[in-house]
């Protein structure tokens, strides 16, 4: 099932020329387009399906600094600041609330692991802290557990995935951006070795820069232009409840569950620290070696699965004529089936821990395919071998909250502005220049 997403009024006219084309209408793409449009840069966003149709509407809706890889923290601190002003910026509610985020822990060993993370986070000024089990129960009453403690970040929050990216897309349009849904980009053309044209299913657009923000599709697009982007996917299942009055305001996770209050009074619920389904596909063998450290880090939860998707990707074209149908038109929206066993398990775990949730009514459920890089941090970078091409992809399940700042950083790189943060950790070349690939946090 595809979650219901706020619609936008797609532009209909394909311009002959622009300065920047953004490929992909998830939160990263729309944040990039919005920032560029606000700076007076002519920008066209092309989305093969609908705005926020894939992972940008299927995620948990958490806006968190807590628990992130320290390489992401400077960008996430900036993103929190941008979220605080987002409703004013886009002229409507995005559901952003600084409700606080709580990681509930049962053992002293788990608390020690959180303390290690906290030591890395302190230099970035994040207001995360360890609290006692008694304090955790006071913040989040009604639990049957006696917690050893918790990691708590008061300034972390939540926003509404099905609303936020469309709101940003509409705001970009109001600033002059052209946003085209159902407009797949088939490829690019170059002049003297640099980007000069984007070819879509509806015609060509001359441009000087392209930002590829294609999520799970970015690796295939890169492959078609002789670039290697190591990328694999994991499946995440989520359910939405009907409104539940007088429930927790905090977003929280513990062993086996996570929950986030929604704008409509219901909750988005998913499994936390449980089995992670990684589908075996041809790229699993192509990129197996570089992903080994991440697989080892996630070994307690990683569950490889062979499915129909292996054959689908095996048969999928790696190259195609720019005047013929591309794979991006053949599949407008990735829509994996939610894993009912996972959702049954999380419902039981949550109800056992917080009896408030025993009477929940499921309104809908869905799954998303999360794109992951070998070190579980994104690529936000120019491509040295192809001037004019920039990548903003590989957010490894961390993209929604960091999206506004990631889009601004991508726009900074395109325009040559002083970068919002040091972009070096996110450079594309780290996968090929001998840099040790060391994941810190698994997706």
What are these regions (language model features)?
Residues 60-62, 156-158, 277, 369-371, ...:
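Glycine-rich phosphate/pyrophosphate-binding beta-alpha loops
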Residues 61-135, 139, 256-259, 264-270, ...:
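Dinucleotide-binding Rossmann-like beta1-alpha1 core, especially the glycine-rich loop
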Residues 2, 85, 106-181, 186-194, ...:
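Flavin (FAD/FMN) cofactor-binding and adjacent substrate-gating region
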Residues 3-18, 31, 39, 130, ...:
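C-terminal lid/capping helical subdomain adjacent to the catalytic/cofactor pocket in oxidative enzymes
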Residues 31, 188-315, 329-337, 345-353, ...:
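Flavin-dependent oxidoreductases
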Residues 37-57:
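Glycine-rich FAD pyrophosphate-binding loop
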Residues 134-138, 304-315, 320-398, 428-432:
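Flavin (FAD/FMN) cofactor-binding core of flavoprotein oxidoreductases
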Residues 13-28, 44:
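Beta1/beta-strand and adjacent pyrophosphate-binding region of the FAD-binding site
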């Amino acid at each position: 099932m595809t979650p219901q997403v706020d619609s936008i009024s797609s532009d209909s006219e394909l311009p002959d020329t622009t300065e920047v084309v953004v490929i992909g209408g998830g939160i990263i793409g729309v944040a990039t387009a919005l920032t560029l449009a606000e700076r007076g840069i002519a920008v066209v966003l092309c989305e093969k399906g609908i705005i926020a149709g894939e992972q940008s509407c299927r995620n948990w809706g958490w806006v968190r600094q807590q628990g992130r890889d320290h390489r992401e923290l400077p960008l996430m601190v900036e993103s929190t600041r941008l979220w605080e002003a987002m409703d004013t910026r886009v002229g409507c509610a995005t559901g952003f609330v600084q409700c606080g985020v709580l990681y509930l822990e049962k053992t002293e060993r788990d608390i020690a692991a959180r303390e290690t993370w906290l030591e890395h986070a302190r230099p970035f000024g994040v207001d995360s802290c360890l609290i006692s089990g008694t304090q955790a129960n006071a913040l989040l009453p009604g639990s049957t557990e006696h917690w050893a403690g918790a990691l708590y970040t008061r300034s972390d929050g939540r926003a509404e995935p099905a609303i936020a990216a469309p709101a940003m897309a509409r705001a970009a349009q109001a600033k002059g951006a052209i946003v085209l849904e159902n407009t797949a980009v088939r490829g690019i053309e170059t002049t003297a070795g640099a980007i000069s044209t984007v070819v879509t299913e509806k015609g060509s657009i001359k441009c000087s820069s392209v930002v590829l923000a294609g999520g799970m599709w970015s690796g295939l697009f890169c492959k078609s232009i002789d670039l290697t982007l190591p990328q694999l996917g994991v499946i995440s299942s989520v359910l939405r409840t009907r409104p539940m009055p007088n429930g927790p305001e905090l977003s929280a996770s513990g062993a086996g569950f996570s929950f986030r209050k929604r704008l409509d009074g219901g909750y988005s619920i998913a499994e936390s620290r449980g089995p992670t389904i990684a589908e075996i596909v041809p790229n699993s063998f192509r990129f197996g070696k570089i992903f080994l450290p991440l697989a080892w880090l996630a070994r307690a939860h990683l569950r490889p699965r062979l499915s129909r998707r292996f054959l689908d990707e095996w048969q999928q074209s790696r190259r195609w004529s720019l005047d013929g149908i591309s794979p991006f038109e053949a599949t407008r929206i990735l829509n994996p089936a939610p894993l009912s066993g996972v959702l049954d398990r999380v419902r039981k775990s949550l109800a056992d821990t917080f009896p408030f949730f025993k009477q929940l009514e499921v309104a809908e459920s869905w799954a998303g395919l999360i794109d992951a890089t070998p070190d579980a941090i994104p690529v936000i970078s120019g491509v040295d071998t192809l001037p004019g091409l920039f990548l903003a992809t590989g957010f490894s399940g961390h993209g929604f909250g960091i999206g506004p700042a990631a889009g601004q950083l991508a726009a900074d790189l395109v325009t040559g502005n002083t970068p919002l943060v040091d972009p070096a950790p996110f450079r594309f070349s780290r996968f090929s220049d001998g840099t040790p690939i060391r994941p810190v946090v698994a997706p």
